Amino acid sequence: MVKFADRMDLLKGSAIRELLALANKPDIISFAGGMPAPELFPVDKVKAAADAVLDESGRVALQYTSTEGWPRLREQIAERMERKNNIHTDAAHILMTSGSQQGLDYSSRVFVNPGDVIIIESPSYLGALNAFKACQPTFVEIPTDDDGMIMEDLEKVLATTPNVKMIYVIPDFQNPTGRTWPIERRKKFMEIINKYEVPVIEDNPYGELRYSGEYLPALKSMDTKGLVVYLGTFSKILAPGYRLGWVCADDAILQKYNYMAQAAALQASTIGMMEVSKFIDMFDLDEHVATIRECYGHRNQLMQDTMAAAFPKEVKYTHPQGGLFAWVVLPEYIDTKVMAAQALEKKVAYVPGEGFFPNGDVHNCIRLNYSNMPDEKIVKGITLLGDVIKANMR
């Protein structure tokens, strides 16, 4: 009999991926995946950029490049981070990855030994939890409120818990809740981090997708001790098919990520990096992101309005100012994993909330995505989901 490593017992198939297999059927209204709207992909511009790369530098594009990644693209990312996030950095402090998911995988492998503690928000991104589980950590969940992680609880844990090796957070439009940390909470967080000197993984795939309110500084922009590792991605602002993300960190930490990348992947895709770089040179990425924001902002508001009309008043849900997701909390006696089968009978798919808690011990929540469905399907799907919820209410 084949014997697998113990860590494989900790890794399960992604509930989201399994749902997407069902939700991809054309008759299903899917609020399950975190997928961008495909009609917004700039196919003609991407083709023009790809043609230019192959015409000008085809043999270079098809060859290996450095582990750090294509130099011109890293320069463009550094400039954008300065302009958008107030993060003062340069190309030397950026490592390209195959999506920010690879950056998450590297993070736990760089910092965590079996049994070490990873502090997370409760709930937290399911994909990060799955990536971290391969390193066999102990998760410590910090409660959240409408403004994100509760700092008093974080400090209590740091003061009393040994072997905390890293803290994982999404301060902007968090997955799954859509919540955003206000400026005072960010400042308090960095004050605590500087006191305890624990590495922080700041995952920011949605930061540019703000539909209302003011942009807030990244934690990395407040980092005076080199403790924050910033993860970015082109998946939400250009196209996930490129599988291009990046890590931004100070020298000592980034060197370890670089070693990990050399061992695990060698590099991100040369041709993909060159095409994205050429796209940024040839076209206005800010203009494209503005188009995305306009579309998703409208769909977010439409979902909010439809939930207000279709859901029972006992149901609570978040009111995101950006990102891709809303978080729905039902009465505790409703198991949303059981209810998901009922919703699928109505041709509606969502992600049950239990997967966003490492112990899977919260059963009454739902994550809804609003970026991928057109208006009429949002209205129809949320209305049908409201009927399913009502049928489960006491």
Question: Where do the PLM segments sit?
Answer:
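N-terminal small-domain helix-loop-helix segment of the aminotransferase-like
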Residues: 7-99, 106, 281-282, 349, ...
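Conserved core of the PLP fold type I
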Residues: 60-197, 201, 207-225, 296, ...
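A non-catalytic, amphipathic alpha-helix used as a structural packing/dimerization or gating element
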Residues: 72, 256-259, 290-302, 380, ...
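Conserved core segment of the aminotransferase class I/II
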Residues: 224-294
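Conserved glycine-rich beta-strand-loop-beta hairpin in the small C-terminal domain of fold type I
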Residues: 277, 294-304, 316-329, 339
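Short, conserved charged micro-motifs
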Residues: 334-339, 376-380
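PLP-dependent enzyme catalytic core of the Aspartate aminotransferase-like
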Residues: 345, 360-394
